[in-house]
Amino acid sequence: MKPHLKQWRQRMLFGLFAGGLLFLLIFIYFTDSNPAEPVPSSLSFLETRRLLPVQGKQRAIMGAAHEPSPPGGLDARQALPRAHPAGSFHAGPGDLQKWAQSQDGFEHKEFFSSQVGRKSQSAFYPEDDDYFFAAGQPGWHSHSQGTLGFPSPGEPGPREGAFPAAQVQRRRVKKRHRRQRRSHVLEEGDDGDRLYSSMSRAFLYRLWKGNVSSKMLNPRLQKAMKDYLTANKHGVRFRGKREAGLSRAQLLCQLRSRARVRTLDGTEAPFSALGWRRLVPAVPLSQLHPRGLRSCAVVMSAGAILNSSLGEEIDSHDAVLRFNSAPTRGYEKDVGNKTTVRIINSQILTNPSHHFVDSSLYKDVILVAWDPAPYSANLNLWYKKPDYNLFTPYIQHRQRNPNQPFYILHPKFIWQLWDIIQENTKEKIQPNPPSSGFIGILIMMSMCREVHVYEYIPSVRQTELCHYHELYYDAACTLGAYHPLLYEKLLVQRLNTGTQGDLHRKGKVVLPGFQAVHCPAPSPVIPHS
């Protein structure tokens, strides 16, 4: 009996060993995969990004996270990444040409990833960029038919269920591209998360064409717009008509006749009683260059201008306008070095961190300051309760530097610009003043025969990096939350006389100055007999 029991035990142990070995082989077979490929997350890329801790104080733009710049400023090519992790807006000249020619494919893409909930980036960015950029190229169809297994016209297609070798190879290539892109995003880490752009290629293309609306914005920006419309902090009461039917020539003539640059001249209360007539510059801003300037540049502070190599072109203009605390030192290759006019908001004058009193940024240039005022442009009310008290530092600066041209924009000029934007937009826009960028553009149009504006409407380098000189990311910097930026850009796009190539590659629009605009004389009023 014992020999039989011993033999039975040996067989049982052998069976267990064989079963365990078989299980191990099956387990290894099914779990063998690329170790570099991450496990899919139940959250989308954008939703994961939202879970990151928000650092710093809330900025003027709703929901923005601010990271202070490192000491000594930023190096444009070391401190800041070149493009967002998916590489969706970084393209060489060849890719750009392909992109421009594949325009038909854009119009049916989704606009913002947050619009449709938990979908991966692949729902909005093509898996295979080469395939995407090649679409619409001459000979593309014949090439694709040969390499991707598509039948030529008149040839029968593959049978259902058949998988040609070329099609299998294409799938393998796409899989490899997908793995490489995912590993690249992981390697970018937090910087990549922050640089993820909520603007899809489709939206950017439609912005270039002037065919976008607020309904295409992500939910956060839509909510911000609704909140500002409800709050109506400045008491806006628009009584005009909202339409967008004017031609470019009609719109230019409207701007020329109504958007007349106006600054405080000290003749109105309460400034007249405070002696401002002697304080403000004797020569008005509009008369500093009575003969006009031939060609001018307006340089936005957008992060998209990094790696543009536009500095030499910008400095070639007769005059250059810059904004707020945007520096040139260390960024000359991209933004140039020349500064003629600097637009500054009231925060620059009141916040000690901007060093308005002693910084070289604000010396040897024409300064133009502004502060949000009530829509009624009640100067007494504004003087008593400005958004930021720019009046005291203005007085001090004028007393110390009486020879430097320094102006404060009149609220009526700013709100006149807002009225024009609203009149030429069918949607209700935010009841807040236009951005410094739009104000600066209109000022230079009044002083120059031709105005070249850089990165106001973004180029293919578009990024959520708000300013090229500080680490601060938010889509609102491009599309607007407080300011009606989206509608400003649509209006400027309608005025653009430059080429689509310059708009795509350089983010440059070319606008005629008011001196170069020829408008019909108003019809004389015939008295009734």
From Swiss-Prot:
Keyword field contains RNA-binding: no
CDD domains found in the cross-reference section: GT29_ST6GAL2
Q: Which residues lie on this side of the membrane: Lumenal?
A: 33-529
Query: What SUPFAM superfamilies does the record point to?
Result: Glycoside hydrolase/deacetylase
Residue ranges of the region described as Disordered: 142-186
UniProt-annotated glycosylation sites, renumbered to this chain: N211
The way it spans or sits in the membrane comes to: Single-pass type II membrane protein
Bias (Basic residues) ranges: 169-183
Q: Name one GO cellular component term.
A: Golgi apparatus
Q: Which domain of life is it from?
A: Eukaryota
Localization of this protein: Golgi apparatus, Golgi stack membrane
Protease among keywords: no
Q: Name one GO molecular function term.
A: beta-galactoside alpha-2,6-sialyltransferase activity
Residues in compartment: Cytoplasmic: 1-11
What is the predominant subcellular site recorded for this chain? Golgi
Q: Please list every transmembrane segment annotated in the UniProt record, as residue ranges.
A: 12-32
Protein name (Swiss-Prot/TrEMBL) = Beta-galactoside alpha-2,6-sialyltransferase 2
Q: Which organism is it from?
A: Pan troglodytes (Chimpanzee)
The gene name reads ST6GAL2
